Each structure stands twice: as C-alpha cells, then as structure tokens.
Design a protein with these regions (language model features):
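Class I Rossmann-like S-adenosyl-L-methionine
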Residues: 1-204
Length: 205
C-alpha cells in the first residue's frame, strides 16, 4: 500500500494502532487525522473507531489468545502482523454484526495489501482458530486474582492491585468490565446555532 492510496476502515484502525504502539501517539488524535486523510464517511469512521478502541481495551487478552495458536509469541511478531491479528480477533470475539468469514478474509487481504503475502497463511490459520473456538476460548492461566483480572480485562496489574485493595474483587471486576464497555456516541447541541428539536428532525428525515 502506497502512502497516497486511500485506506478503508480496517486499514485506518491498523495505522492508528501502529502509531500508538510505535510513537506513543494519542489514539484519538491519530484516528482523527487518519479518518480525515482517508475521507471516511461517518459509518466507516465509526467502524474504524470501534476497532481501534476495542483492540486497545482488550489488547492483553487478544495477545494471549493469539499466542495460544501462533508459533511465535505475539511480542515477537512483526508489528503490522500483530495488529492485523488483533483487529481480526477483536471482530470475531466482540463484534456480533461482523460475519466471522468477513473478519478472516479481510485480515488476509490486509496482510497482502501490506506487502506480507507470505504471512497471509499464518494469519488465516490463527484467525480460523478464533472462529472455531469463539464460544469456548482457552482458559486463562490460573494465578492470583490480580493476574486473572489484569489479563481478562487488559488493565495494568498495578491498577488492578490498587482497586482490589480499595474496593475488593467484586467491585473491581465490575469497574473493569464497565471500563471496557463500548462508549455510546453522544451529540452536544450548540444552543447559539440550533436547537435539539432541529437536530433531531434533521437526522430523522
């Protein structure tokens, strides 16, 4: 893929995730810039945003499952391949409206578009294991409550330990689950320019 080619939603999400990993960029700034550069419509922009934030919220869990079925440890994979696997795995596990076949096929095609045709077979094989086991994924390692919650909800262990100390295991798990929930889109109306009724009418007609 050349720099001048416009990207789709999945490629935009991948580019944003790679910028976050490589350059410690703010995810929202990277996303806004890439969405604007590639002129995504509102639907694709929302899809790219969901993929990017969803992967970030579940990164540790996704990497654990990738490691279950990949010959290489996730941290040793090329960043672009690791990102593609994370995006594919996230769609399979967390996005009911995305057909599993589409998640796998798009990941394979994205691998080829990124100039890694030799890795396409591996990406296909790993994500097919996600599909085969998505209702019964491998058990997480047995360990302390903090270790389990940190991996399950992809939060740093120091934070989990702090929460456990403050509110106990049940409240900690509830907080972590809520923190990973998909955030609803909200619209704030500028009363100096329009009214809530006018905005509602515009979107209903």
């Amino acid at each position: 893929m050349t720099p001048r080619e416009k990207c789709g939603a999945r490629d935009v999400a991948l580019d944003a995730l790679m910028q976050v990993d490589k350059a410690n960029a703010w995810s929202d700034e990277a996303l806004r810039r890439l969405i604007a550069q590639n002129r995504l419509d509102s639907r694709d922009a929302a899809f790219a945003t969901r993929l990017c934030y969803g992967v970030m919220q579940n990164r540790m869990l996704l990497d654990y499952y990738i490691g279950c079925w990949c010959a290489q440890k996730p941290e040793r994979l090329e960043p672009v391949i690791r990102g593609i696997l994370r995006i594919g795995g996230y769609q399979i596990l967390f996005m009911d409206k995305v057909p599993h076949r589409a998640a796998v096929n798009e990941a394979v095609e994205m691998t080829r578009r990124r100039g890694r045709p030799k890795a396409a077979g591996m990406v296909n094989a790993v994500l097919r294991r996600f599909v085969e086991h998505w209702m019964n994924m491998p058990d997480l390692p047995k360990g302390s409550t903090a270790d389990y919650l940190s991996l399950r909800y992809s939060h740093p262990k120091w934070l989990v330990l702090r929460l456990l100390d403050l509110v106990g295991p049940d409240e900690t798990q509830a907080f972590l689950r809520l923190d990973n929930d998909t955030v609803p889109t909200c619209i704030q109306v500028n009363p100096l320019r329009t009214t809530a009724e006018a905005v509602s009418y515009t979107h209903l007609t």
